[in-house]
Every structure is written in C-alpha cells, then in structure tokens.
C-alpha cells in the first residue's frame, strides 16, 4: 500500500472564453472530469476539484445530447449531485497544500490549451506529487500541462524520455479546429509532448479509447478515454 495520501487533486481548466470558429466559448469538457471523479471516489480517494483561478466554465459542446450518455445527462441535470456540488465550490489551486495529495489528475477541454501551460498553482501541486513518488495523470487536451511539470531531480519535464498520449492532430483536423489553434498561437498536444522530449503515441481512430502508462505517468487520448485513464491511474497508485 502506498504511504502517500489517498487524496487526489482533479485539475479543471479556468479558461472559459471564446475559442470555436462560430464564436462559442470553450472550457471544461464535462465528462473528462465527471468520469475520473467517479472512478477515483469509487476507489476510495478523497477528491478535491481545483482550477488555477478558482473559476471554471463548461464547454457547451461537451454537454449536448450527442456528447452525453443518458447516465451522464442524469448527473449533469442533477445540481445536488456530489460532483456538481464540488464543481460549484471549486477551489483555487494556490490555496491548497500540495503535500496533501498522492495523485494528480488533469481533466481537459480545449480551455486547457490556454491556461494549463502557465498554471503555476496546478503545476506546483503536480510537481509535489511527482517528487514524493505519486501518480500524475492527464487526458485529452490536459497533457498541455505536462511539459511544464518539472522533475526536481533533473530539472526537465516529467515527460522527458517517457511515452505519452493526448488528443491527436488528426482529431483537431476532424473537428475543424487545427486552423483555429494555429491562429491563436496555441500548442497542439502532439507538438508540446515532442518538444518536451517525450515519445507520443496515438490510436488508429482519433476517438478510440486509448491510454498509455509509463510508470507513474498515465495519459489518455480523448473524452471516451477519460474513464479508462482514471482506472489506470488508480492501478498505478496501488502499485506504489
């Protein structure tokens, strides 16, 4: 059994401004936080939700009838649900004690491309978890934070020399968003990973369930992979 606290920090993007070509805002991809939260709490973790600024917004594209299963929709529409209550009372990362956590899980949404690379409070928590031998995990666009999480022993990113996945360039093209990402000067997940010295892997289909486990580093490719990524993160924690 791990000597680390069985407490997880579930990171949420604080950016919820304009992004989509039609003018829609982006933000948190709802199920990429809901599904990991469900897995982590079922595994006995205490889970705190935090963003860099203590604010959040939900990407409207993530809560459409096509994006949510019937079970997800029931949760989303139940404002008294424990997850929704915690989301409504989201914490500011810099107000938290990094040493309280043994697992760091970064949820996603395109908002993460804006704020995660410079989210000093969230990065500090992840660096503490990593330095103490804990698990760092991220899904979909959340690996945008990984190049900026430093290994205190090497001074390099924790993904340097490791294998990761994350949302694919192919997926951005399928969603007709790659041009917008480039226009805004944002860094696609693939590019950020490779620049940080990681080996990037991807599934055959952009929305196939796909995860990569490299020791204490656990990543997933897309929204359908959020549940499986959290399951793998719990398994990695239990092996510590």
Regions found by a protein language model. Name each.
Residues 1-132, 145-240:
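Extended, subdomain-level signal for the structured scaffold at the beginning of enzyme domains
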Residues 135:
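Active-site cofactor/cluster-binding pocket
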Residues 138-143:
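Short, thiol/selenol-centered motifs that function as redox-active sites or metal-ligating centers
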């Amino acid at each position: 059994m791990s000597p680390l606290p069985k407490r997880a920090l579930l990171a949420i993007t604080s950016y919820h401004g304009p992004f989509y070509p039609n003018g829609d805002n982006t933000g948190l991809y709802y199920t990429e936080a809901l599904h990991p939260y469900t897995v982590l709490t079922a595994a006995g973790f205490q889970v705190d939700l935090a963003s860099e600024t203590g604010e959040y917004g939900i990407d409207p594209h993530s809560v459409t009838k096509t994006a949510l299963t019937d079970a997800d929709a029931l949760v989303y529409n139940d404002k008294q649900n424990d997850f929704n209550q915690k989301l409504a009372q989201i914490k500011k990362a810099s107000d938290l004690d990094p040493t309280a956590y043994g697992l760091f899980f970064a949820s996603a949404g395109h908002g993460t491309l804006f704020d995660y690379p410079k989210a000093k409070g969230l990065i500090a928590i992840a660096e503490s978890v990593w330095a103490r031998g804990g698990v760092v995990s991220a899904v979909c666009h959340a690996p945008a934070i990984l190049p900026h999480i430093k290994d205190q022993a090497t001074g390099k990113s924790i993904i340097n020399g490791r294998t990761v996945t994350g949302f694919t360039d192919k997926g951005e093209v399928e969603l007709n968003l790659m041009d917008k990402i480039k226009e805004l000067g944002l860094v696609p997940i693939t590019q950020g990973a490779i620049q940080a010295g990681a080996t990037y892997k991807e599934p055959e289909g952009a929305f196939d369930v796909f995860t990569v486990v490299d020791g204490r580093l656990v990543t997933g490719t897309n929204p359908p992979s959020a549940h499986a990524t959290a399951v793998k993160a719990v398994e990695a924690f239990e092996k510590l």
